[in-house]
Amino acid sequence: MTSSSSSPITFTLLLLLSLLVALNPNPSLASTGSNINTNDIVTQYSTYVRNACNVTRYNRLCVRTLWPFAIVARNNTSKWARASVAVTITDTKRVLRLLLKTQRSAVGESERIALSDCRELFVDSLDNLYKSLAVLRTLNADEFQRQISDLATWLSAALTDDDTCLDGFEETSSRTRTVRMVRRKATKCMRLCSNALALLKKLAFDGL
């Protein structure tokens, strides 16, 4: 990780750690707070997120989007998978809002159709992501294999939806600023979904 990318991570982790110490009702923790080596702690949490993201194709994007969850997720594979789906949901909703806005100002029939089709695909993708998040919140050993199978189906479908949206823009001759912006944001969303699927595969391998 470069210094430019790790700097905001370090700052926010330090801020979160300070808040945890300040808000912790345990006096012993507060009294020993000055003895905590914050640099070592930040390094440890950075290691957690880097280790989690090692299995992903878009590693830098994974680290950048998931590091706020390091304090909670640590070495818990299921928490990392859940966090990645939650992040993808947030980004998918942003893309949907953008598609709704840009569809009204589309230039030409081919652009309007591409934006409309993309919106339908992202609606379906969001539905699959929500179903995935619901299951990730209720994982249990007795149903784990079935749950993993369902999750793989839904996340793969969400990724296919994102890919199909991008393919639609390849087929249109429109290269307006609107199309370029939507493609850029949809590409990020597709990559987040790919990372979520990779983390799910790690969860399937590691187990609960």
Curated annotation (Swiss-Prot):
Gene Ontology cellular-component annotations: apoplast
Entry's Gene Ontology molecular function annotations: pectinesterase inhibitor activity
A biological-process GO annotation: seed coat development
SUPFAM superfamilies with a match to the protein in the record: Plant invertase/pectin methylesterase inhibitor
Superkingdom of this protein's organism: Eukaryota
Keywords, comma-separated and alphabetical: Apoplast, Disulfide bond, Glycoprotein, Secreted, Signal
InterPro entries hit by this protein: Invertase/methylesterase_inhib, Pectinesterase_inhib_dom, PME_Inhibitor
Cleaved signal peptide residues: 1-30
Subcellular location, principal: secreted
Compartments, as annotated in UniProt: Secreted, Extracellular space, Apoplast
Residues bearing carbohydrate: 54, 75
SS bond list: 53-62, 118-165
Glycoprotein among keywords: yes
Keyword match Transmembrane helix: no
Protein's job: Pectin methylesterase (PME) inhibitor that targets PME from seeds and modulates PME activity and pectin methylesterification during seed germination. Promotes mucilage release by limiting methylesterification of homogalacturonan in seed coat epidermal cells.
Sequence similarity: Belongs to the PMEI family.
Protein name per Swiss-Prot or TrEMBL: Pectinesterase inhibitor 6
Species per Swiss-Prot/TrEMBL record: Arabidopsis thaliana
Gene: PMEI6
